[in-house]
Amino acid sequence: MDKAKRKAIIAGNWKMNKTASEAAVLVDELVPAVQDAGCEVVICTPYTDLVTAVEKTKGTNIHVGAENVHFEKSGAFTGEISADMLTDLGVEYVVIGHSERRQYFAETNETVNKRTKAALAGGLKPIICVGESLAQREQGVTEELVRMQVKIALNGVTADELKNVVIAYEPIWAIGTGKTATADQAEEVCAAIRKVVGELYGENAAKALTVQYGGSMNPKNAEELLSKPDVDGGLIGGASLKADQFAVIVDAATKG
């Protein structure tokens, strides 16, 4: 399967931005801006915006995702949200293992794996984030590290479940910094992700996998990044908070 046959996915990660009323305005702007998209469009919002996002995107081509999910179905886990709670709202995707979760909230490769399996069991499509720090890149261990992150994240995930998994390469040094991996750097790691998935699940499964790049993708660099053969989409931070900028990236994915 070549790139043209894979599903390109542009997912906005709003992070801790937008109140419910602000979200309503942004979604109203997004709907017409991306209605002709030739790729799948996802917006991953704070929990407090999910109901608004789901209601306002009904009947449109925009899918809704959450930014995290707990690995238990229910119980005494104050402040947490389960996969069943999200799917009951109409949420389809969930971001798992974002570098900010790893940095600030003690996320580990093992908890990423637990969340991934819980998300899949609950009917969600996980967007699993992997990536290296600047120090790790300078040490030359990027590929080794990312391979390990992918292997642990997918431990216990079946080949059938893999069809609902997206993996996003997000170099930590490019998250929220304005720095971006070059298109060649992004391609190199996205290809390595596809290679390790091939070793685990076979070549056909690897060729079918959607691999995103996340890390300060914006209207200026999106087309070059998305033109690479192993970059199938983007996990977009800051640019997803402005409808016009997000739409430019969606258009670039359609071309790519």
Label each region the model flagged.
Residues 1-256:
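Active-site loop-to-helix "anion-binding N-cap" substructures in soluble metabolic enzymes
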